[in-house]
């Protein structure tokens, strides 16, 4: 295997990521290997390791593409409406995205780095960027000085919505309810935000003293 190089390093990186993404979309993470990527792009397996640190690095960059695609979709939904309307649109877009890209989205939670390996800062920034979308939608419910409470509320909402979408994409939602995922998400958002607006949630609690954590993608 192998061919004379006709691509720039950046083009070759994109070829590798395109091939890896296609493999994951069809076969899932279990089907991904350096050998299969190399076969598809018609380069030697060693070429992959010249472009990326290892296969985990390749996977992280595919995950980054997924996060960027979701962020691009969410970024168009914050222009109009009140907090409940905006958060509901974000949540419904999240649900739709997971159903449209089930294997790519599951990749974010199936892929584990070796013990003791931290997520790179550039990856953490992409996660924070997604959380910032939810925080922006919640902003009208939190006065100045409640930024950490707003961060916490965004993560509570994300965890709840993600739970519903996970059951839905796994076809397990019917085990606990006959309601649709879309209806459950709307109820979750409306109920939680009504509590915040009435002073029964994070907006009324004492200011948080510790930094609110980013929801973990890697367990």
Question: What do the predicted segments below correspond to?
Answer:
Residues 1-11, 200-219:
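N-terminal intrinsically disordered/low-complexity leader segments
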Residues 10-21, 25, 30-31, 42, ...:
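An amphipathic alpha-helix adjacent to DNA-recognition modules
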Residues 32-39, 48:
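Append "Primarily bacterial transcriptional regulators
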Residues 62, 66, 70, 94, ...:
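Hydrophobic/aromatic residues within well-ordered alpha-helical segments
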Residues 75-104, 128, 144-147, 153-157:
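Hydrophobic alpha-helical connector segments
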Residues 100, 157-176, 191-202:
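Amphipathic C-terminal alpha-helical segment
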Residues 108-117, 173-175:
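Short linear capping/connector segments at secondary-structure termini
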Residues 117-142, 151-155, 183-194:
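Amphipathic alpha-helical packing segments from all-alpha helical-bundle domains
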